[in-house]
Amino acid sequence: MKLKKFFAGVVAAAMMLTMGATAAFATELEPVESKTVAVNNNTVTVQKIYKLDGQGISPEETFNFTVSDAEVTNAGTNVNKNALPVPTIGSAKYEATVEGGATTAGNTKKITIDFNKDGSLIYTGVGIYTYRVAETAGKTLGVAYDTKTYTMKVTVVNGDTVGSYKIHSVSFTDNATKQKDDAPSFTNTYTANTLSVSKTVDGALGDKDYPFEFTVNFAKNTENAEKTWTDAITAEKTDANNSKSTVNITSDSASFTLKHGESIKFSNVPAGLTYTVSETAVNDYETKINGNKTATAAVNGKVTTSADTDKDEEIVTYKNIKGIETPDTGVILDNAPYIALLAIVAFGGVALILNKRRRDEE
């Protein structure tokens, strides 16, 4: 009986020791997060996605990132909390080409965060290290920079040998949503499109072979005054026979002529510009811009329209009308039948009056 009680006591003591050891281990090492990124040779990667909204080719640009605001919890005694190690982060370079720049589907690159320095792990003690990872906003016109900030948590534990350390896990939390993210990414968008200007001549006296003079100017609008612009706009003119030719753009402007049925298209116009289209007025022509009637233009004047660019295609139509205002003769041929009819009626009336008078005299 005493022996049974002794064994029962031993079993109970063993269970208590096991539970205590389990609890102690649990507090000593935090389990791996359900959402972590893969660690390869003490490095992790995040994604950079560059998208195109509209039509155009994004300018060459290198996107940079920062790792900052280092903090640590559960730090070992040999960790200097006033000089915490900070990993390095790479950059993403995009070319000014169709395939090497922003694309509609999104051009994706890998950004490496490196926890090594001179071939060794930067950490010299255990702890849970946290950082803020963000993109450095640039100033390229037409580019929307990602303002997202991630909190990166790096859990460092004892290594396989005394005095060595290793990364147990790396996880990211989106600071905006407070959600864990196992595929952190930064997305930028380049927005650009086209501007088209066309010419139509109408009216009985409209000269369809006359070359109307135009000037188009581009300038950064007030909201984007601090942005930089690479001036990569191109222009192509199409005549009435669908033949195409290049139009030079200098100093943010282009001068050209358009006849009836001709047009010009400016490509790769970034969002954030203000364009101004001006036509040199020709005497006696009424001008309509995008179907809206304007006053008859005076000689040497300008007929102008302007707007800001965005992701949508801009289309400007100029229609010049010159009709007959005052007849050159006293007779309008279109009224001749009615005049002849009135003459016949008048002649008949006179004949009746004369015939009646003759009868009365008899």
Q: Residue spans of the language-model regions?
A:
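Solvent-exposed loop/turn and edge beta-strand elements of beta-rich ligand-binding domains
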Residues: K2-E362
